[in-house]
Each structure stands twice: as C-alpha cells, then as structure tokens.
Amino acid sequence: QRAPGQLSGGMRQRCALIRTLATDPRILLLDEPFSALDYQTRLSVSDDIHNIIRREGKTALLVTHDISESVSMSDRVVVLSARPGRVKAIHDLSELRGLTPMQRRDHALFHTYFNAIWKELELSA
C-alpha cells in the first residue's frame, strides 16, 4: 500500500518486469536492469527476475557491462568489441543452465568464465 515513489529500487525493478510481462512479449530486453541497485538488492532481484523469466518461458536479452551479472544470469554471453561494436566472442554457459544466479556465483566454472571474458575485454581495450 505505497505510492510508486515510495517503493525501493528493487521493488521498482520487480514492478517494471511484471508490467512488461503483462504485455506477454516473446523477448524481453533488459538494459542494465540492476545498475541503480545496491549489491545485496541486485543479487536478490536477479534471482527473482531469473526465476520469473524461466517460469514464464521467456527469452531475455541482457545488456550489461558487469561480467559477474552476465555470467550469473545468462545461458550465452556475447562479447562485443569497442566501437564499432562487433561480435568478438560467444560463450555458451550451458554447464550452468538450471542454476539460479546465486548458485552460479558459487559454481567452480563461474570464475573460469569470468576470467575468460575479462581477458577478452582487456585485449580490446
């Protein structure tokens, strides 16, 4: 029972996703969806959004500069070069499929993927 301006950042993100899902889109575009959230809220909301997307059987395109976020939320990570943006590499994260973002962060392969993506970004800098 709060006015929209009184909601926390995490609740606003959840409401935005629910509002988007109400239109029943086939594909969701999530452009830096967690950038305005503190770290603890970011982890909680990412699990919630991941679960909603899976439950609803949706495809989501996540745009982020946060490597941890990309590995924890995605089935596939596409690394782009600097301008002009071209596909530099594609990482298939199928070994992590079925895990929540929090579970992925604890998985041994999380750091392997993170480091591989980081190295590619360093090379393009």
Question: What residues fall within each predicted segment?
Answer:
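Conserved beta-strand-loop-alpha-helix hinge in the C-terminal portion
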Residues: 82-112
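Conserved signature/switch motifs of ABC ATPase nucleotide-binding domains
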Residues: 2-5, 23
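Conserved catalytic segment of ABC-fold P-loop ATPases
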Residues: 72-79
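Hydrophobic anchor residue at the start of the ABC signature
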Residues: 17
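Helical segment within the ABC ATPase nucleotide-binding domain
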Residues: 42-57
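Conserved H-loop
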Residues: 57-63
